[in-house]
A protein has these predicted regions:
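Alpha-mannosidase-like glycoside hydrolase catalytic domains involved in N-glycan trimming
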Residues: 37-167, 290, 294-298, 302, ...
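Sec-dependent signal peptide recognition
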Residues: 2-8
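Bacterial Sec-dependent N-terminal signal peptides
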Residues: 10-38
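Surface-exposed loop/edge segments in extracytoplasmic proteins
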Residues: 98-104, 202-207, 384-390
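Catalytic cores of extracellular degradative/oxidative enzymes
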Residues: 298-299, 303-821
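Disulfide-bonded cysteine-rich modules in secreted/extracellular proteins
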Residues: 145-150, 169-187
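Extended, beta-strand-rich, solvent-exposed assembly scaffolds of outer structural proteins
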Residues: 178-268
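Extended Gly/Ser/Thr-rich low-complexity repeat segments
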Residues: 131-141, 263-277, 335-337, 371, ...
Length: 821
């Protein structure tokens, strides 16, 4: 692979009322909104700086060091507008000191052949403490020509990883005998339950008297009994034992030792209740074992990766990065069946400094003994201890990472020219004119410092994804990401990157040991990881310890790592994108998703929206040369094909553009339709021709319900209502309603439109998270994707909902706007 310094070549390698149904079909496909001249965008100072008018784009590099840095090699992701960077175009860079060595990697292209996203690495020199320097990126060869490739040397001191893996006893107490929602034999008021826990000569006794909401045999009361024991056991000072209640554990109570290596114990119970209680043994105690990957093994793996170009991420004169997969072996040379170290090793300055992104995964899909693991971990560079992790429980199918530096750490922050980055269509256009108060950013930092952000913990995230109500991770992007995109403030960045890391603890990560990639439906079309049962040939091994903090789903899923990857280019975030997109497809009953097709329509409409977003994010972010690029592009195309074939003129669907609610096919939540429209609008804007037919179809309902007050009596005040009935019964048959006037009168009989009709209160018209705000984002995205009426409708709706503007100042999650230029 050719290396470039002052010139980087973008090298791509393979890898209305009363109308008839037909009146609602767009006559032509809507095209993307015409974009402004690039120089006009680059002159926008919303990010605090402007780019040279002849540049393609620019970024600001800020030193965070207390002393001068002779060299400051940086890598960042850069989105490009369609057509701005055709395939094969050379790039070069300059800053205030002159020419800057530049390399290009990780190129993702659009259907038109132009670059959507690339990873840029630049070698800045003599960066002073606190200095802010503009890095201008230009198209074409550098005036001085290209420079020779850099020779990289493997450091003499390698990275070693040691994990002491514990196998503490795990017992489980199950209270009662309920059958689903049918109560079992009840616990009566005044009955006493006693648990006696014994280890050697030490005994702990814990008793709970049944009273109040503990009385009964339903899962609600049984859960409260389990919680009563949980709180009592864990509150004991200097106790030996720990109670576990995580996720949807209901009437079950896990029991183990606080120190994982202490030994076995017994559980005895006494009660005067007729309701049954049982004790199950889930895991027997076993002595701890040391597993390790040595520095010698790491150095050899790195040398082989360089010589054979194995698992490359960055290859050029500024930086070279490869992914190393290091099995952890015990004294007998046996690799741990589940725990593995992955190291994204980036060599800089020829290898004089190295950035190791150490990733610990408990994620192999088909390896034996899946389940939660308890271990401590130490990492060393040579003899220097650089990471010392106390014993903790690593959830099944989860991962975490830490960045370790060998040699001087590069201390610099890259800030993007957001007007250009958002104009690219790769990320949503947020309102860069919002003046986010210092108090809001300070509060974000204070809350983050107080949150539990340890390994496998949740921070600001809601572990039970299905919890009702708006929250900060649900939106086009999470609140913390929106805050960062608008402000590029370090405190918002810390919140965004922290939560991008925390979602690694969610048990959705299934890696195929054969491909070393996320579990795919080409190899395993009959697998399911979430519901129902896999086909025998694709069945996953059973887990003995699967309780976690988390209960993930698709309908309440955030976009956690797309923007972090787009801005940083880090492999960890790219892998995370793939894991979430894969889990969304792999979770369904195989027959419902079309086996290997990976169809997403069985999910409720909001879930279809977020799953399509995740799938689109993976497909758009993955470099063209990545082995999984074609896989995700194909699944995205499969879903477009299904939607375009299903939602068409003459089909058994709403001719007004409402999607089918799989759980109640006579109604639709307009907000859910808006979620879906928001996503397909972005995919259409970002270059997917297959996205246009389904975008046009859903836009009939999404934009149309704001446009038919005058001609069909569909009052704008009701446009963002909670749920709307869109099906009627005719001669005993259910048929879609085919005109706006009838839809409105079916849902609001006798209501007429006038200026005094208040906005539907169910839309929360003064909230930053309500359905009225959701509609704003959808209308803006639709305008950006080329809908001819959406921009005017957006402006009308903004004027009708002024309270949202103030709400956006503290929570801009839904503050998507039309393009600035």
């Amino acid at each position: 692979m050719k290396n470039w310094i002052m010139t980087a070549l973008v090298a791509l390698t393979g890898c209305g009322g009363g109308s008839t149904p037909t009146d609602h079909a767009p006559a032509t496909l809507l095209e993307p909104r015409q974009s402004a001249a690039r120089a006009q965008i680059l002159a926008d100072s919303a990010s605090g700086f402007v780019c040279a008018p002849e540049a393609v784009t620019c970024v600001e590099v800020s030193s965070t060091a207390s002393s001068a840095q002779a060299t400051a090699p940086i890598t960042f992701g850069q989105p490009f507008r369609s057509g701005d960077l055709p395939t094969g175009t050379a790039l070069h860079a300059q800053d205030s000191t002159g020419a800057v060595p530049l390399q290009v990697d990780g190129v993702s292209t659009r259907e038109d052949g132009s670059v959507r996203l690339a990873l840029l690495s630049a070698q800045l020199r003599n960066l002073q403490p606190g200095e802010k320097r503009l890095l201008q990126v230009f198209a074409g060869p550098a005036p001085g020509g290209s420079m020779p490739a850099t020779s990289y040397t493997v450091p003499s001191e390698g990275l070693s990883v040691q994990a002491t893996v514990y196998k503490p006893q795990l017992s489980q107490v199950v209270f009662g005998n309920r059958n689903g929602h049918t109560p079992g034999t009840p616990f009566q008021d005044g009955e006493v339950i006693t648990l006696t826990l014994t280890m050697g000569e030490v005994t702990e006794t814990h008793s709970v008297t049944v009273t109040g909401n503990l009385v009964g045999g339903a899962f609600t009361s049984l859960t409260q009994i389990a919680w009563a024991f949980h709180n009592q056991i864990n509150a004991r000072a200097n106790g030996l034992f720990k109670a576990i209640k995580e996720g949807e554990s209901y009437e079950t109570l896990g029991l183990t030792t606080r120190e994982p290596g202490r030994g076995p114990f017994t559980v005895n119970l006494q009660t005067n209740s007729a309701s049954p209680i049982r004790v199950d043994s889930l895991k027997a105690f076993a002595a701890p074992q040391l597993y390790q990957a040595t520095a010698t093994e790491q150095r050899a793996a790195l040398q082989a990766a360089i010589e054979q170009n194995l698992k490359p991420h960055l290859v050029g004169a500024v930086a070279r990065e490869h992914t190393l997969v290091l099995p952890l072996r015990n004294a007998q040379g046996q690799a741990h069946p589940q725990l593995a170290a992955r190291v994204h090793t980036r060599l800089l300055d020829g290898g004089a400094r190295v950035r190791h992104d150490l990733v610990m995964e408990n994620a192999w899909a088909y390896n034996p003994e899946p389940g939660n693991l308890t271990y401590s971990l130490q990492a060393r560079l040579g003899n220097q201890l650089v990471l010392d992790q106390a014993p903790f429980t690593h959830y099944h199918h989860a991962r975490w990472h830490r960045v370790l530096w060998q040699g001087p750490e590069v201390k610099a922050v890259v800030r993007h020219h957001m007007p250009y980055a958002m104009a690219s269509g790769v990320i949503w256009q947020y309102n860069l004119d919002l003046k986010i108060a210092e108090r809001t950013l300070a509060e974000e930092a204070t809350r983050l410092a107080a949150a539990n952000t340890g390994l496998m913990q949740s921070g600001f995230l809601t572990p039970y994804f299905g919890t009702t109500g708006g929250r900060h991770e649900i939106g086009p992007y999470p609140r913390w990401t929106a805050l960062y995109l608008i402000t590029q403030d370090d405190r918002a960045r810390a919140s965004m990157m922290t939560h991008a890391d925390l979602v690694g603890g969610v048990p959705i990560h299934y890696r195929d040991a054969v491909t070393d990639q996320p579990l795919d439906l080409d190899r395993h079309p009959g697998v399911t990881v979430r519901v129902a049962t896999s086909a025998p040939a694709d069945a996953l091994p059973a887990m003995s310890d699967s309780g976690t903090l988390w209960s993930p789903d698709i309908a309440h899923q955030g976009s956690f790592t797309f923007v972090p990857y787009v801005l940083t280019g880090d492999v960890y975030h790219l892998d995370e994108l793939m894991f979430w997109a894969a889990w969304n497809m792999n979770g369904y009953n195989p027959g419902y998703r079309g086996l290997g097709l990976g169809l997403l329509h069985p999910e409720q409409v909001r879930g279809q929206a977020w799953a399509m977003r995740a799938l689109g994010e993976a497909a758009r972010a993955l470099p063209d040369a990545h082995p999984m690029k074609r896989y995700f592009e194909t699944r995205l195309a499969n879903n477009f094909a299904w939607y375009n074939d299903t939602y068409k003129v003459g089909g058994p669907v709403s001719p007004l553009g409402a999607l089918v609610n799989p759980y109640q096919d006579d109604t639709i939540g307009p907000w859910q339709n808006d979620f879906f429209g928001l996503v397909v609008a972005q995919l259409a804007q970002d270059g997917y021709a297959q996205a246009r037919p389904i975008f046009n179809w859903v836009s009939q309902f999404n934009v149309g319900r704001f446009m038919h007050e005058a001609d069909a009596g569909y009052c704008v005040a009701k446009a963002p209502a909670y749920y709307v009935k869109v099906v009627k019964t005719v001669d005993g048959k259910r048929v879609p309603i085919d005109n706006w006037r009838e839809v409105f009168q079916t849902n609001w009989p006798g209501v007429t439109c006038d200026a005094n009709l208040p906005l539907d209160p169910s839309s929360y018209p003064g909230s930053s998270l309500g359905y009225a705000a959701n509609a704003r984002a959808m209308l803006a995205a639709s305008a950006n994707a080329g809908h001819p009426d959406a921009l005017a409708v957006y402006r009308m709706w903004v004027a009708r909902t002024p309270g949202i503007d103030n709400a956006f100042l503290t929570d801009p999650t839904w503050a998507v706007t039309p393009l600035r230029h």
